[in-house]
């Protein structure tokens, strides 16, 4: 049905069918290895792929297969298993595939979520790609959103009130902390003071500024025990979706943006860089 829509929309008024379509067919794969599933809304099941790939091949100048293993994939095996589904689909449909798009899911590092080095993911993907029954000139695509962007942004919040181990802050579930509230994710935090605190750390939860009881971030977030009203806290690793999902609910949402060039609060890019090249890449 969706393929028919694309063909109709790209057919010229005189009835000429488009000859330059690049089409990627999404296959549904497991999200079992990821912290956030993206398997329910999109993707064709394995038994649907043969007919769909064959029909798409007739309409496409370049045909691809894509998938998404889910957000924050915690093991490289997620991509190896998905590529096996791609292999089976290609063999069953007996079509030429020009593009394999492994989608996103590349992780970042958060408290309680420490994935293997990204290099391990790349090695599994390259090894699987090289063994697929595809043309020598086929392209390998990926969409490394979180892995690239998570480290780039922090939010500095002010503590408005403290009640025991609960801190009331001026950002929350309807701001940059959606994932902390609705998914229960933890993010690195640090107290911003001219002089470091000499008290021990203890776990806190956060409440945001809105009228909604759901504006709650359970954490736990480890901060010095003497943190209180008027203090400022940096919450890091919010570059992936935090700022993009901010709203103005209840009249909140005004922020000041500052460009800083300090190191991120956590990173997966601390090791030496390695260049991985396919055997059919020639350096001139």
Predicted regions and their residues:
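Active-site-proximal beta-alpha core segment in soluble small-molecule metabolic enzymes
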Residues: 1-101, 106, 113, 124, ...
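Glycine-rich nucleotide phosphate-binding loop and flanking beta-alpha elements
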Residues: 2-4, 31, 73, 108, ...
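Solvent-exposed alpha-helices and their adjacent loops that cap or buttress functional pockets
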Residues: 15-18, 34, 57-59, 101, ...
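Generic domain-boundary/flexible-linker signal
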Residues: 34-36, 76, 111, 151, ...
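Short helix-capping and hinge/turn segments at secondary-structure transitions, especially at repeat
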Residues: 88-91, 130, 134, 164, ...
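Flexible, glycine/charged-enriched surface loops at secondary-structure junctions
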Residues: 96-99, 137-141
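Conserved N-terminal phosphate-binding loop of PLP-dependent enzymes in the Aspartate aminotransferase
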Residues: 117
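Charged (often Lys/Glu-rich) extended helix/loop segments that serve as interaction or gating elements
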Residues: 124, 139-284
